[in-house]
Each structure stands twice: as C-alpha cells, then as structure tokens.
Curated annotation (Swiss-Prot):
Protein name in the entry: UPF0058 protein AF_0738
SUPFAM superfamilies according to UniProt: Vng1086c-like (SSF140371)
Gene3D superfamilies from the UniProt entry: Uncharacterised protein family UPF0058
Intrachain disulfide bonds: none
Pfam families noted in UniProt: UPF0058
InterPro entries in the cross-refs: UPF0058 (IPR002753), UPF0058_sf (IPR036519)
Domain of life: Archaea
C-alpha cells in the first residue's frame, strides 16, 4: 500500500475509535494507541509508524468485539445515539 492509503485506513480506524469512545464503550482499549502518539493528521510520520498505529487500533477494536457481541453493541443506547447522529440511514428499520 502507498503511504496515502495507509493514512486513509488509519483515519478510518481512528474514526471507529472515536465512535466507540463517544458512545462510552471504549474503556482503556486504546491506551497503547494513545501512548504511541501517532494520529492520522501526522502525515510527516513514517509509513511504519502509521502501520503500528493501525495495528494498535485494530487490537483495541477487536478487544471490544471480544468482550461484547455485535448485537450488544448495536443495542447499546449510547452507540445507537452516536450512529443516528452521524449516519441515520443505518438505524432505519
């Protein structure tokens, strides 16, 4: 992958992280990522650093899914509120 594609993937996973945090679901799952200090806006960072950040984001997201079923996450009122505010079409029956 090119660096631009890596950064786009990093940004996508970062947005998922923020979604979980805003819903109150992430409880320390992204501590290692936060400590790394590499965010998608840090375009001057190396491709390797962005790959490490992606790996840590994936780890945090997978830990959330390991602890909670997708059904539990979907039924979470906090997450539902966040999803409705950013993508209401996903919540329509």
């Amino acid at each position: 992958m090119h660096k631009e594609e890596i950064i786009l993937l990093h940004l996508t996973l970062y947005n998922i992280k923020k979604l979980f945090e805003n819903a109150g679901i992430a409880n320390g799952h992204f501590k290692a990522y936060d400590e790394l200090g590499v965010q998608p806006v840090h375009i001057h960072k190396s491709k390797t650093e962005h790959k490490k950040a992606i790996s840590l984001l994936c780890k945090g997201i997978s830990e959330i899914f390991r602890e909670r079923s997708p059904e539990d996450l979907i039924e979470s009122e906090n997450l539902k509120f966040v999803i409705e505010s950013i993508a209401p079409e996903l919540c329509e029956p």
